[in-house]
Structure formats: structure tokens, C-alpha cells
Amino acid sequence: MNTNVFRLLLLGSLFSLSACVQQSEVRQMKHSVSTLNQEMTQLNKETVKITQQNRLNAKSSSGVYLLPGAKTPARLESQIGTLRMSLVNITPDTDGTTLTLRIQGESNDPLPAFSGTVEYGQIQGTIDNFQEINVQNQLINAPASVLAPSDVDIPLQLKGISVDQLGFVRIHDIQPVMP
């Protein structure tokens, strides 16, 4: 009789233990699905921004648009050659937004000293029918590069616009600066 009770207790314990193991696996699976859902949502947002950035640049006759949410560089044919531009280190600031404009030359020559114009603001409407609102601009200057291929990081402070409000940054009129 003692062995039967012992077996019954052992069987009950094993059954309870297997139920616990299954519950922890279910919890882990739910956590994994939740994490995957969040990552997919973020990827979808980035995909929309990349598509918008590409469409804006296809329509642009002057300069290149960079959308903060796209996290993707765009190419600009300029007087100093083909440049890849991207926005990095976008952070809130007490006066607005700070970010770094990364400019990369695509040739095997160092970049000359150059200047350009940066415009930034909000986009209202659809990509097919949009308006740039609250647009501000600032001039940028970059020294000549010594190495090739060249990368230039230009820190920018975008006053009067928060990270959430920043809809676009457009760079245009890149010109060599004569010494």
C-alpha cells in the first residue's frame, strides 16, 4: 500500500511539474511573439519612411531629402561628385533637435572644402501632394578631406523643432569652396 501511495504521489508530482514546464514555455513563447511583434512594427514604420524618402527624392529637382525615420542614406549628384548622405545621432535638445549629417564621397578622391544649405521642417499632406511647413534653413561648411574615400560628419542643431515634429531634412546647393 505504501508503494501505491508513493507511486501516486510521484505520478502527481511529475504531472504538476510537467504542467509548470509547459507554462514557462508558453510564457517564453508569448514573450518572444511580443518582441517579434514590436520589431515588425518598427520595421514597417522604417519601410514606410524609406518609401516616402525615395519618392520625395525621385520628385526632387534640387537636393536630397532625408527623413529621420528612414534610417537610410540617400545619394546626391553635386558639383563635387556623388555623395551619400544620412542622418545619425538624432536626439532632443533644449532648443530643438541635434543630429549629425554624415556625408560620404563615393569617388576615390578626397572631398574638397564645400558649402551647402540644409533645410528642415515638417511635411503635411501626402507624398504625392505635400507641403513643407515651418521650414528653416542654415548654411553648412566642411573642410577639405585629406583621405579618400572621404567621410564628413557635420553636427547640426535644428532650433525650434522637436524630434517628433521633424519631418524632413533637405540638403542642396553643395558647392566647392575656393581657398
Which positions does each model-derived feature cover?
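Sec-dependent bacterial lipoprotein signal peptides
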Residues: 1-20
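Contiguous hydrophobic segments
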Residues: 2-5, 32-47, 51, 155-179
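Solvent-exposed, flexible loop/coil residues
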Residues: 5, 70, 115
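Short, solvent-exposed coil/turn linker segments
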Residues: 16, 22, 162-165
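Membrane engagement elements in two modes
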Residues: 20-88, 92-98
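Membrane-proximal structural modules of membrane-associated proteins and complexes
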Residues: 73-179
